[in-house]
């Protein structure tokens, strides 16, 4: 049976690991170290570690794989194939070249578009109507390897980064399992990425999280769903942070300055730069838990007036 080393960290990677382990001999799992999580900073293992332990697979958690003693140990396992999915570190050539069939990666975009660590976020932020998963060879340069297989999936108006992560995670596992038999048999010819079509999905900055109400409504709507459920788009209300977790978009022109509030007793609408409307459905005022808009409007939201503007 083909011996595989798997490397991954977040929940996105778990279905890939589980599918691999159901059909192949996964001899080791490499993931990031346990990290403090939440307000109480409780040391928490990555989702992949939990899954690997449940499957009875040995787990390695080097802080920096490139300089760790575990690197040589992994090479000495003489795996037939290395598979990665959102591991989180650049891998050295000594490891990439050690398996018989090399190293391949499950990447959540239609390469060469969106190389980098936040491809799902950017597909939503840019208003794409489809994205997908690419299986490609691993090289030292970030997400630059030749492509082995690719599969597309639509993005709907109701999707956000969270829903697309779930869909792409399952799609990636399915595509990998469909690809591996022919790949291991040497029946697939990989295709180089077109350098003219390369784009990057760098990690989201704090500046990208803040809503600019002078922008078109469609752009703001894509920002909200592209940053949900993490890190979450925010604006300010009376100079305090105000997160918008979920919203809908109304493509109707309305008069009013950007950030102007239109409200009745149960709904809240905010004017965007082109006069269209953002209609928040799940929000989080400063110092409060996340709540649906009806709860907000029956409480603190009752005090909002038409002279109040978001972003001020």
From Swiss-Prot:
Enzyme Commission identifier(s): 2.1.2.9
Alphabetized Gene3D superfamilies for the sequence: 3.40.50.12230
Keyword terms, alphabetized: Protein biosynthesis, Transferase
PROSITE patterns documented for this protein: GART
Catalytic activity, as annotated: L-methionyl-tRNA(fMet) + (6R)-10-formyltetrahydrofolate = N-formyl-L-methionyl-tRNA(fMet) + (6S)-5,6,7,8-tetrahydrofolate + H(+)
A cellular component term, taken from the record's GO annotations: cytosol
Residues noted as binding (6S)-5,6,7,8-tetrahydrofolate in the record, renumbered to the chain: 109-112
A GO MF term: methionyl-tRNA formyltransferase activity
Membrane spanning stretches: none
Function noted in UniProt: Attaches a formyl group to the free amino group of methionyl-tRNA(fMet). The formyl group appears to play a dual role in the initiator identity of N-formylmethionyl-tRNA by promoting its recognition by IF2 and preventing the misappropriation of this tRNA by the elongation apparatus.
Similarity remark: Belongs to the Fmt family.
Protein name: Methionyl-tRNA formyltransferase
Organism for this UniProt entry: Listeria innocua serovar 6a (strain ATCC BAA-680 / CLIP 11262)
Gene that encodes the chain: fmt
């Amino acid at each position: 049976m083909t011996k595989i080393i798997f490397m991954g960290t977040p929940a996105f990677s778990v279905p890939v690991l589980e599918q691999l382990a159901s059909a192949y001999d996964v001899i080791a799992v490499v993931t990031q170290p346990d990290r403090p999580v939440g307000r109480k900073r409780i040391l928490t293992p990555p989702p992949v570690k939990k899954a690997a332990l449940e499957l009875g697979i040995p787990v390695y958690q080097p802080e920096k794989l490139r300089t760790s003693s575990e690197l040589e140990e992994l090479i000495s396992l003489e795996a037939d194939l290395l598979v990665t999915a959102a591991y989180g570190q650049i891998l050295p050539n000594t490891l990439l070249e050690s398996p018989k069939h090399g190293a391949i990666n499950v990447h959540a975009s239609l390469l060469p578009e969106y190389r980098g660590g936040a491809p799902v976020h950017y597909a939503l932020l840019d208003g794409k109507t489809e994205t997908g998963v690419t299986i490609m060879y691993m090289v030292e340069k970030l997400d630059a390897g030749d492509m082995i297989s690719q599969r597309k999936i639509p993005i709907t108006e109701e999707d956000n980064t969270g829903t697309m992560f779930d869909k792409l995670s399952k799609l990636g596992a399915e595509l990998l399992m469909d690809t591996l038999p022919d790949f291991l048999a040497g029946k697939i010819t990989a295709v180089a990425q077109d350098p003219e079509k390369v784009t990057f999905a760098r990690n989201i900055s704090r500046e990208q999280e803040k809503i600019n109400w002078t922008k078109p409504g469609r752009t703001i709507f894509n920002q909200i769903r592209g940053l949900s459920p993490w890190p979450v788009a925010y604006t300010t209300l009376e100079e305090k942070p105000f997160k918008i977790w979920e919203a809908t978009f109304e493509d109707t022109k309305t008069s009013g300055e950007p950030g102007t509030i239109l409200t009745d007793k149960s709904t809240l609408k905010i004017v965007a730069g082109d006069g269209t409307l953002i209609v928040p459905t799940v929000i989080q005022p400063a110092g409060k838990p996340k709540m649906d808009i009806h709860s907000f409007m029956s409480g603190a939201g009752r005090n909002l007036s038409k002279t109040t503007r978001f972003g001020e």
